[in-house]
Amino acid sequence: YLWLATLCSNGFGGILADDMGLGKTLQVIVFLYAHYIVQGENNRNTLIVCPASLVYNWAQECQHFAPELPICTVAGTAAERRELLDSLPDHPGQILITSYDLLRRDIEQYQNLTFDYQIIDEAQFIKNATTKAAQAVKQINSRFRLALTGTPVENRLGELWSIFDYLMPGYLFSYSRFREELELPIIQQQDEDALHRIQKMIAPFILRRLKKDVLKDLPEKLEKNMYAKMTGEQQELYQAHVQRLQMLLSKQSPEEFDHSRIQILSELTKLRQLCCDPALLYEKYTSGSAKLDLCLELIHNAMESGHKMLVFSQFTTMLDRIAERLQKEHIPYFMLTGATTKQERIRLVTEFNQDETPVFLISLKAGGTGLNLTAADIVIHFDPWWNTAVQNQATDRVHRIGQTNRVLVYKLIAQNSIEENIVKLQEQKAELAEQILGGDNIGTPFFSREELLELLQ
């Protein structure tokens, strides 16, 4: 709280980058409670912007911890939202909660409004400075700006620049100057002076505490890679796709490679789907999936020991396949995807934390952030994602304040496949965030045609 109050009183913005599960939402609620209730600033306006899936979660958390706060969700039809925003000048002292998407749509209504406090949650949503979401949050007139994210840097330094461009425009220069003086020297030349310079510039405005330093009594988290060996038709289909992609890459010139990145990404996605279950690509495929069998084995073993678990996948079609197996084996489960409504999300989370349902199937994109599911103590990542920070965020739906059991994390990996190389790539990308936020050595998060060929080895 003192850090937030100091920044606010001195006219600076900041990034609250605490490790996932350390209560960033609650810290903001305490900050607002101190200003609105304790200090009686009942004419101040606040805007909280978050992913659409978290709007009602924010409102619920505020109601739970500080019911006195004047919370108002900006939702409903365009006409209803316009009426609410138009009335704000005559009724100050509101804490508005809206989504990035609705802010973008309603940006004209916000042009004549001024906010004392502007908070963006899951600030990685604005890591690309050219997106409409990033442009929208930067257009708001606000006195104090705060960004919440457990991952200020996921892939490249330009993401950090975009967040600071929202917090304090110009502090990290224009992007072209930032890229020339800091980003390129660090990434391409391993320039230690540039690294120390950016660390020194951002340090006062980033508060990052790790669970191991703050929560001494948080139960341990054990991670284990579980390997599944593809056999028979699954292995044959996978190898055929690998050979086709290797041939495509080896024949391309650098210019052709640059112009076919979307096609290559599509082919890589197909390889990842084949590792999961060839039925995701071939409707008539019936020969089974090594990873699906392994996943069901883990689920059965966990249930026999009385555990509840989350199963994450990037592919909702894979979750459907797992659900089919669970139904056949009469195992109760919940499922949450991008198609799940906000109200239904809250209901599913509440019921899972209270009842005996052992399995919660969750798409990584839809449920990897903003959920509290400490009733579970086992996490299964069915397929690895390019960036380990995304999977860590998902794991921390379980490994967070309120967890009383040791947490087991199983990462399912198809043996001798692209998935093994994705895991290696995850480790490299994790280096970038560690360097900027206090680490030592410099690595590169990018890959060339040659590195893509290595992924296929």
Map each language-model feature to its residues.
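ASCE P-loop NTPase motor core, strongest for the SF2 helicase catalytic module
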Residues: 1-191, 197-457
